[in-house]
Amino acid sequence: MSRDTTTPDDAAAFEAAATTSGTATSAGENIPGDLLPLCREHICPVCPEKAQADEQRLRALADLENTKKRLQREKDEQVRYAAETVLADLLPTLDNLDLALQYGQGSAECRNMLVGVEMTRKLLLEALGRHGLEAVGEAGEPFTPELHEAMSHEDRGDMPADHVATVMMKGYRLKERLLRPAKVTVSRTPG
């Protein structure tokens, strides 16, 4: 529902503009392009419907821009961490290679096999590292709950309290996202 907000002076100006151009018009049809903005400016300078429509248009444009930005952020996040599930599935393989190296150290018969296992582990870590995977959790570093999962405490006089005493299972991080915390024992002062 539109209201007629024209005054007699506005109507006269519109009629004069239409007569001057030699074109009779109804509701702004057939007005030359240079007269149309002038007519709109004088007939409805503060039309509430136009102001409301302009506000709705600006809000819709702002919503569109925000949606575009959000979708781009989500896409970037997906691309950045696309390999997360595959890399997480490979972590038990790395654990088994570490266990094979750990338990085969004492056997002379396994020496040649251990060289092959060590080379395989190194190649796998290098390949995964190119995709952003890195190991976390080293003995002697300060215990950090964001990176380490404390499995037990260990009385240690040779290191400060609340440091990683033993790494039971390495943790891994993909770029800034932790895939698995390192399972560690935490030192405490004997007493």
Swiss-Prot record:
What function is annotated for this protein? Participates actively in the response to hyperosmotic and heat shock by preventing the aggregation of stress-denatured proteins, in association with DnaK and GrpE. It is the nucleotide exchange factor for DnaK and may function as a thermosensor. Unfolded proteins bind initially to DnaJ; upon interaction with the DnaJ-bound protein, DnaK hydrolyzes its bound ATP, resulting in the formation of a stable complex. GrpE releases ADP from DnaK; ATP binding to DnaK triggers the release of the substrate protein, thus completing the reaction cycle.
- Xref: CDD domains: GrpE
InterPro entries linked to this entry: GrpE, GrpE_coiled_coil, GrpE_head
Q: Does the keyword Oxidoreductase apply?
A: no
Q: What is this protein called?
A: Protein GrpE
Q: Might you report a single GO cellular component term?
A: cytoplasm
Q: Where does this one sit in the cell?
A: Cytoplasm
Biological processes per GO annotation: protein folding
Family of the protein in this entry: Belongs to the GrpE family.
Which superkingdom heads the taxonomic lineage of this protein's source? Bacteria
Task: Drop me one GO molecular function for this one.
Answer: protein-folding chaperone binding
Coiled coil ranges (UniProt) are none
User: Where the protein is mainly located, per its record?
Assistant: cytoplasm
State the taxonomy lineage.
Bacteria, Pseudomonadati, Thermodesulfobacteriota, Desulfovibrionia, Desulfovibrionales
Assembly state and interactors? Homodimer.
Kindly state which keywords UniProt assigns to this record, in alphabetical order: Chaperone, Cytoplasm, Stress response
PANTHER family in the cross-refs: GRPE PROTEIN, GRPE PROTEIN HOMOLOG, MITOCHONDRIAL
